Amino acid sequence: MKIFISIASYQDLLLPITINSAYTNAKFKENLRFGIIDQCKVKLDFSKAKLKDQISYVHIDPKDARGPCWARANAQTLLQDEEYFLQVDSHTVFEKDWDEYLIQYIQTLKKYSKNPVISAYPRGFEIVDFEKKVFRKLQEEDHSTHVMVLDREKTFKDGYFSMQKGLPSASKEIYKGFLISAGFLFSESKMIED
């Protein structure tokens, strides 16, 4: 089961780290394929990377960038025959065996919904040492599910980009939601085709 990983990046120095984190922490590395729209001054070179054949990479000068939605739409055009679609921000750190977990979770959700989508705000992390690629996960002791909700304090107020936030929930129930995060979105690829 192949997973297409869609990444739209705008001058993000963490993009190579995100790609490496997804690849090294995947259980089935051979089933990953990356579609990357990199809006950055410096073009990345994957010619010597062991995953070079698993990357479709488009470099765009940042002065020609047209925003995150445009870049994400372009990344989606790189989708081929992969069964699953994962869209993440270009500054994401992955957990061990994340690929197996997400596929199993989607299969569980299919018992309740025909076309499930997993979406969330990923847990934050801080950069301890960028040169040595040392990061520390925030909220590491918090194993609860964070449910996306509208933030009443920010809804429709000037100066706020997002009106959503994640709230911890101890519930193990599966709930249908109405909010989506473009920074982490996983589903079957037919969602993009539809």
For the regions a language model picked out, list residue spans one by one.
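Catalytic cores of eukaryotic secretory-pathway lumenal/extracellular enzymes that build
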Residues: 1-194
